[in-house]
Amino acid sequence: MLKNYAVTIAISSIAAFFLLYFLFAYSGIMLSVESGYQIGEISRWCERISSGYFREPSNALSNIGFILTGIFMVWILSREEVTGQNFFIGFTSISVLYASASIFLGPGSLMMHGTHTVWGQWIDNVSMVAYIIIPWLLNFKILNGWSENQFLAAYFFILISFSVLSWFFGSELGIDFSLFGLSTVSYTHLRAHETELH
């Protein structure tokens, strides 16, 4: 069963990420400096830009916290029994998706702060959207009686659409639209509406 290997899969995925990161960084293929900045200057994220494997070492490596939190979630979920009422107890598709999105936040942000590349910024935005749309869509699932398959279909449709569109048109999709901002505002309004219903 997959849940017996979940922690091993999560740790192996992160180990592969760091191995590839260091191989590409060592080869010089993927490191850059954000436009308008130079090595030794202070970045817009308040850290001096380094010439090492991580352009912003503290900002990049602080994302290990997301990775460890996600792996810890996977470890707990793989040991719990599914209750049927709470989507976040036991090894359910939604709980695993949430833990995976937490893990993904780490490499996503690390790529931005570590590489200073346009695609590093892109994957950072994708990882944030991957995480924030889960509670947003979960409220739609609850309020509209969606099945898990409907929830997952909507999630991956939004995430893939955002990923492709933001690659070609930027994170505001070329129309000054912030899916991340919309997600946080919509989530707040949905929670307020849900509270009124109870």
Where do the PLM segments sit?
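Alpha-helical transmembrane segments and their membrane-interface exit regions
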Residues: A130-W136, S183-L190
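Single conserved hydrophobic/aromatic residue that forms the stacking wall/gate
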Residues: H189-A192, E196-H198
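Early transmembrane hairpin module of multi-pass membrane proteins
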Residues: L2-I175
